Amino acid sequence: SGAVRTAARLLELATEDAMALGERTDQEERDALLTSLGVAPGGAVPSALRSQVKSLEEDQKRRKTRNLRDALDRILVDVMSILRDVLMVQVNTGLTFINVTHGPAIEERAAATTPEMTLAALDATREARERIAHNSPPLLVLEALLISLSPAVKGRV
């Protein structure tokens, strides 16, 4: 379905964003550690020092996971800001959109849904953020969210 493909694409974008933040830094940190331990660039790491290198690699892996969760959270915050704009249109606040470049899509969504549906979508997005923060599988969280946001799910969101 379109929601599943979109979820996969969003995860791909978030992963690219997260990896871009860390790859160069990871190599620089590893090189700095090896230099401080007296290991020549490209040289073999003595067994007595491997635990320090392993510890650094584990820290880097945790940071990558955190970067991915942060990137996904940024996407979900963007979704929430769009839904906020939809709700503003639905309740006729007269306030300016936050996401002015998406005005036509916001107007279309506002006309096609009710304020109750938009509030449910905001709640589903908040729940997705919580699930990501609690280490749920990101692809499953995004798929569930996007399926729940799809217009085909009548009466829910």
Regions found by a protein language model. Give the residues of each.
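AAA+ P-loop NTPase domains with strong preference for DNA replication initiators
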Residues: 1-113, 126-134, 138-144, 148-155
